[in-house]
Regions:
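N-terminal amphipathic/basic-hydrophobic helices that include classical n-h-c signal peptides
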Residues: 1-15
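Extracellular ligand-binding/catalytic regions of CAZymes and related secreted enzymes
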Residues: 14-20, 203, 211-283
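Short beta-strand segments enriched in small/hydrophobic residues
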Residues: 18-32
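Residue-level signal for short, function-critical loop segments
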Residues: 27-29, 98, 222
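Short, solvent-exposed loop/turn elements at domain surfaces
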Residues: 31-35, 201-202, 227-228
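Helical hinge/lid and interdomain linker segments adjacent to catalytic or ligand-binding clefts
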Residues: 35, 39-130, 282
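Catalytic beta-strand/loop cores that center a nucleophilic Ser/Cys/Thr
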Residues: 68, 143-218, 255, 269-274, ...
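A glycine-rich, often tryptophan-bearing local segment used as a flexible ligand/cofactor-contacting loop or short
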Residues: 99-167
């Protein structure tokens, strides 16, 4: 529910009262259709597995708003992310790998706009190289990687953070792809998780940022060749993350000329006014 409040310094401002959280799980959905090994873990797609897990865990946190979970994929018209659908979305979860370049820039633009207005964005695993993640962070987002069926130990370094609720000191995934530092991202607002891999590398595997009015969470695990999204700890992290990332406000910024709050005194001098009127299309 959105409660709109008059405000002289913004075109449109809303306080979000969370009665339900609308989530879209976006997946390029390529590997599952092309690779038997991946399809064995995710017969209906990674997006379907994540969506099902979110629905099952939705009521496990006392007082948490219920979830409305839907999915979208690359091959749908407008990648399933129309303006109308994004306008209703509170949190967008993004998984991509081999088809980053196929995502239309116009869709990236509208996702960016919604994050800046307040929509939450959760980027998973190889989504670190997606257009939208690199756009929001403004860096290359590169890292080291290795596929060697390694154990990953994920340490909870901020146990009081809402995304870490219900987890122990650490949890382990028996097989995962290694990601290693340096992870070329801006300094995060918070580092919630730190991963250690069997080969010796470490990686900042749970990071948060704020961009505009929206919250962003990057979560490292999730290589398509492994059943990572069936893991209960991973599912708990995602369930916590959607509650954390859900918008608190929804603000469409338009750089308006603001009327004075107080009566202005008459001035004895006159200056030339050089003003350029800008509309939303100019921003």
């Amino acid at each position: 529910m959105l409660a709109f409040l008059p405000h002289p310094g913004a075109a449109r401002r809303a306080i979000v009262q969370k009665t339900r959280i609308s989530i879209i799980v976006w997946n390029e959905f390529q590997h599952e259709r092309e690779n038997d090994a991946v399809r064995a873990h995710y017969p209906e797609g990674i997006h379907s597995t994540i969506a099902t897990a979110l629905r099952e865990t939705a009521g496990s946190s006392p007082g948490a708003p219920p979830l409305d979970v839907s999915t979208a994929t690359l091959d749908q018209p407008e990648h399933g992310l129309t303006e109308e659908r994004l306008a209703r979305c509170d949190v967008l979860i993004w998984w991509g790998h081999k088809a980053h370049a196929k995502v239309a820039d116009v869709v990236v633009d509208r996702v960016q706009k919604r994050v800046l207005e307040g929509m939450g964005l959760i980027v998973l695993h190889s989504g670190h190289f997606s257009k939208i993640f690199r756009r929001m962070l403004g860096t290359n987002c590169s890292l080291k990687w290795r596929e060697a069926d390694e154990k990953e130990r994920i340490w909870v370094v901020e146990p009081s953070h809402p995304i870490a609720a219900g987890l122990g000191e650490y949890f382990e995934l028996p097989y995962e792809e290694m990601y290693g530092e340096r992870f070329d991202v801006p300094a995060p607002d918070e580092t919630v998780f730190l991963s250690w891999f069997e080969g010796g590398e470490v990686f900042r595997s749970g990071l948060t940022w704020q961009r505009g009015h929206g919250r962003i969470f990057y979560f490292r695990p999730g290589h398509e060749a492994y059943p990572t999204y069936h893991d209960r700890n991973v599912q708990r992290v995602l369930a916590n993350a959607v509650q954390w990332a859900a918008p608190r406000v929804n603000i469409v910024d338009a750089c308006p000329m603001a009327p004075p709050l107080e009566k202005l005194s008459k001035k004895d001098v006159t200056f030339q006014k050089v003003g350029i009127l800008q509309g939303k299309k100019d921003l």
